[in-house]
């Protein structure tokens, strides 16, 4: 028992290094890690036995051990001989503990690679000695640089297949060093090796006497990760408000930067409230000081409203606070990122609604050239400006990986669709304020004697939206209501005349109309909006511009065949003939509302009858 305790204590004091392996398909990443695990004697007897069996069943090395099978855990991976998901493995040597992430090489799994790289101290970039630098090598190296990994190993693998040729290695190393310099990666160690044969893997190989550097494991054991910057200003993202009883109120989280002591002056962001640290706890133990990386609980001298997601920071050097920011975004979803579309942005423990207001450029990760883009597709990287519904406290990613990184979440599926690194705040965001006005929307509604709201008619072209809205408008006007119609066709003659019918411009079309409708509701009007508005996200964006009782979604539902048969304007015929592109229902989707306030079956009634249903819903007696 004493020996076990001694071993555990020894493990506690060993330094930990997190690293990833990345590169192109079949460069040997899984084989390299599997061989390291084998050499480090970290495998149990049953794992070794399973490896022998699996090598015969799935292996690609004949009668020899297939080390890659230690990493390729998914059935699909073993059957295809590729890595799909990020595989994390732990091993240790006498000098150090390691957590290694084996990242997939296929281009469609670049998002998985970015996940593995987000917490890494170092990256091992594998290159097949027979092929040299490939597209995916450049892509992964760009992401390594983007995510701030400062230590990179170029592992030129499969040297056994080129006869351990020195010139081959040096040519590849020269090409990669030029790429690394272009990407701003300054610390690169180039190592020739054979993951299958074990050359220069755990120890130096006699087969390459011309190489005088360390083996891969020797380099990783000696590598010193970037130290935590204790001189940086203190920042604590609050993860939890700890209130076990009425006598204690603490704020818990992991210090993202600097150090904290009792008596330190702090500011709470984004509120800007100022206080002083009274007590500092590390776990249940009260301490005189805590440093970055430690989980702490702070108590403050003042009763301040602090919630999960707020940041407690040093008063003399706080993080920036902004509701508009610029950032590099790696898109990770099959559905493209579109400017104006709404997502959840999660920065630490803080969650706010956000949209990309502008894609300034897309980065060609193969050449690092900047290209014009109106959307980001899966695995693409763009430099974007984001607009947030509420201000957030952040530090640029180049200075702090914790307070400078975020993810984007789909508001319907809750899937992570993007990851980003913050660059800066947009300064004008903090200089624009609401001008207080004496006459508000309540006063304007009162003088008109009505409850303002927006009726948002949505449906396919030819469903009858405009006809129904027009009848409702006439009847409300006859009853003395103050109304206005915003019709999709009419608005495109003026306000939105610069917009086309691409997905991107459709999103902007609805954003503008929603803002105009909001102004009209503030003026006390009943606004009838008649737009196809095919995308659920944009209709949700419009809904969020209004109070809960101000927005009525009216789904004018009609089968596509019925709408196409009507075809009053001849648009369906032109779309079928290819004369019109991006036409809703033909080559552009319509996403039906899942829960509209009012569902009209336009094929089961006349426009007059359907208009009566709208008025009945509103509780209005028509003439």
UniProtKB/Swiss-Prot annotation:
tr-type G domain sequence ranges: 14-228
Record-annotated active site: 533
Region (G1): 23-30
Matching SUPFAM superfamilies: EF-Tu/eEF-1alpha/eIF2-gamma C-terminal domain, P-loop containing nucleoside triphosphate hydrolases, Translation proteins
Source organism, top-level taxon: Bacteria
Stored InterPro entries: APS_kinase, CysN_GTP-bd, CysN_II, CysN_NoDQ_III, G_TR_CS, GTP-eEF1A_C, P-loop_NTPase, SO4_adenylTrfase_lsu
Region entry G5, spans: 194-196
Pathway: Sulfur metabolism; hydrogen sulfide biosynthesis; sulfite from sulfate: step 1/3; Sulfur metabolism; hydrogen sulfide biosynthesis; sulfite from sulfate: step 2/3
Molecular function via GO: adenylylsulfate kinase activity; ATP binding; GTP binding; GTPase activity; sulfate adenylyltransferase (ATP) activity
Region entry G3, spans: 102-105
Region (Adenylyl-sulfate kinase): 451-623
Biological role stated in the UniProt entry: With CysD forms the ATP sulfurylase (ATPS) that catalyzes the adenylation of sulfate producing adenosine 5'-phosphosulfate (APS) and diphosphate, the first enzymatic step in sulfur assimilation pathway. APS synthesis involves the formation of a high-energy phosphoric-sulfuric acid anhydride bond driven by GTP hydrolysis by CysN coupled to ATP hydrolysis by CysD. APS kinase catalyzes the synthesis of activated sulfate.
Family, per entry: In the C-terminal section; belongs to the APS kinase family. In the N-terminal section; belongs to the TRAFAC class translation factor GTPase superfamily. Classic translation factor GTPase family. CysN/NodQ subfamily.
Protein name as annotated: Bifunctional enzyme CysN/CysC
Gene it is expressed from: cysNC
């Amino acid at each position: 028992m004493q020996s076990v305790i001694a071993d555990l204590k020894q493990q506690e004091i060993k330094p930990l290094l997190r690293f990833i392996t990345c590169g192109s398909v079949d460069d040997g990443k899984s084989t390299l890690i599997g061989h390291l695990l084998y050499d480090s004697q970290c495998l149990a007897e049953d794992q070794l036995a399973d490896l022998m069996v699996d090598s015969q069943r799935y292996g690609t090395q004949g009668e020899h051990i297939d080390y890659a099978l230690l990493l390729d855990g998914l059935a699909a991976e073993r059957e295809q001989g590729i890595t799909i998901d990020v595989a994390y493995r732990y091993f240790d040597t006498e000098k150090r503990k390691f957590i290694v992430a084996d990242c997939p090489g296929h281009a469609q799994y670049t998002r998985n690679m970015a996940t593995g790289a987000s917490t890494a101290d170092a990256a091992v970039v594998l290159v097949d000695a027979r092929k040299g630098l490939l597209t995916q090598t450049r892509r992964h190296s760009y992401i390594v640089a983007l995510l701030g990994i400062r230590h990179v190993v170029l592992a030129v693998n499969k040297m056994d297949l080129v006869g351990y040729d020195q010139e081959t290695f040096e040519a590849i190393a020269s090409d990669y060093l030029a790429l690394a310099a272009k990407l701003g990666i300054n610390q690169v160690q180039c190592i020739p090796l054979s993951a299958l044969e074990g050359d220069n893997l755990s120890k130096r190989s006699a087969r390459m006497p011309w190489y005088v550097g360390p083996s891969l494991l020797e380099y990783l054991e000696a590598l010193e990760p970037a130290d935590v910057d204790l001189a940086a200003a203190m920042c604590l993202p609050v993860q939890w408000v700890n209130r076990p009883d009425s006598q204690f109120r603490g704020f818990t989280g992991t210090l993202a930067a600097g150090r904290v002591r009792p008596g330190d002056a702090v500011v709470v962001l984004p509120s800007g409230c100022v206080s002083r640290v009274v007590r500092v706890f590390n776990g249940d133990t009260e301490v005189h000081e805590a440093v970055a990386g430690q989980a702490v609980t702070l108590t403050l001298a003042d009763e301040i409203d602090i919630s999960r997601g707020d940041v407690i920071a040093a008063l003399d050097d706080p993080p920036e606070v902004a509701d508009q920011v610029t950032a590099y975004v790696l898109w990770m979803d099959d559905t493209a990122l579109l400017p104006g579309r709404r997502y959840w942005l999660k920065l630490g423990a803080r969650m706010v609604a956000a949209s990309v207001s502008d894609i300034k450029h897309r980065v060609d990760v193969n050449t690092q050239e900047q290209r014009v883009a109106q959307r980001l597709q899966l695995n693409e990287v763009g430099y974007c400006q984001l607009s947030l519904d509420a201000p957030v406290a952040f530090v640029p990613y180049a200075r702090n990986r914790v307070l400078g990184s975020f993810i984007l979440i789909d508001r319907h599926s809750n899937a992570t669709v993007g990851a980003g690194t913050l660059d800066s705040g947009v300064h004008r965001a903090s200089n624009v304020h609401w001008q207080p006005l004496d006459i508000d929307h309540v006063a304007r509604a009162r003088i008109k004697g009505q409850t303002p709201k927006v009726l948002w008619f949505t449906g396919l072209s030819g469903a009858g939206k405009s006809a129904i809205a027009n009848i409702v408008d006439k009847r409300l006007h006859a009853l003395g209501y103050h109304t206005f119609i915003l019709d999709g066709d009419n608005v495109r003659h003026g306000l939105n005349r610069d917009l086309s019918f691409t997905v991107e411009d459709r999103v902007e079309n609805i954003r503008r109309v929603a803002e105009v409708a909001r102004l009209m509701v503030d003026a006390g009007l009943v606004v009838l909006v008649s737009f196809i508005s095919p995308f659920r996200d944009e209709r949700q964006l419009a809904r969020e511009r209004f109070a809960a009782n101000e927005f009525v979604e009216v789904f004018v539902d009609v089968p596509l065949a019925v709408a196409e048969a009507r075809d009053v304007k001849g648009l369906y015929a032109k779309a079928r003939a290819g004369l019109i592109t991006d036409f809703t229902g033909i080559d552009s989707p319509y996403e039906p509302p899942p829960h509209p306030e009012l569902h009209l079956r336009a094929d089961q009634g006349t426009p007059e009858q359907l208009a009566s249903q709208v008025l009945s819903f509103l509780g209005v007696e028509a003439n």
